[in-house]
Amino acid sequence: MQRRDFLLTLAAGTAGFLTACTAEHPAPRADSSSPPLTQPPASPSAATSSPTPSPTPSLSPLHLQDGPPPLPAPTPADSLITGLPENVGNVVAITVDDGVDSSVVDAYLDFAKDSGVRLTFFVTGIYPSWTDNRDKLLPLVESGQVQLANHTWTHPDLTTLSEGALIDELTQCENLLHNAYGVTGAPFIRPPYGGRNSFTDATCAKVGYTTTVMWYGSFGDSGLLTEDVLLGEAQKWLLAQHIVIGHANFPTVTHLYGQIIDILRQRSLLAATLDDVYFGPGHNRRV
């Protein structure tokens, strides 16, 4: 074989070998059904989840009302009141006197927050409960759900006082309401023990307390009562257009809030402050 023929034969054999190798290991080709290698499928944990809605707050079992009850246009209070005007309908004013026991005042505030019941506190200023509970009471005062009025500084019988001593009793309590809560108690004064006459009424009016507030029924709990007795008084007096007195002096009433709400529900009663009735909801008593 000539050298030239040998080289041609060798080149042809090499080309055939390379062709065979290529056939055994074909190059990969793109498959349109496969995802790109740079974009692997997202795992379930990487999927975007929708936000979980916040749960709706549940109402307290004591809940009775939201805000003031529907009321007619207010009419100015007389110089002496014992009950609410007839045209207010199924509305009662629950008023709470004294404040001997700070824990009872605190419990009344929880009752107000849980039930929505609107309360008028007649404050006897010498008791520490009115400063002890300031931080908890202040938002309720500012919202108008709780009203503060004057029940004197030391709870004396007003009919036994001179004009100067009576004015001092009112002024000291008024100063507490102003300094601690930024409000006035005027024009509502409740005389301790119900002791009043034309002289006390006129003297109170000289310092802005032009309406003496008496009552049309009481829980009777200025002193310590059993639960059965107090509940009986509540059943007797929680009626439409009544101004009813309770006292923040002993814890008995704090065990009966559920039963008091039951009475109000059974009688379709809502509670209003004196401001709601005589000035209209939203009355500003800041000074």
Language model regions located:
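Active-site metal-binding loops of divalent metal-dependent hydrolases
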Residues: V96-G99, T152, A248
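Short amphipathic alpha-helical segments
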Residues: A107-Y108, R134, D201-A202, Y257-G258
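Residues that form or flank phosphate/diphosphate-binding pockets in enzymes
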Residues: S103, T131-D132, F199, T252-H255
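N-terminal pre-catalytic segment of deacetylase/amide-hydrolase enzymes
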Residues: Q2-I94, D101-A107, D114, D135-L137, ...
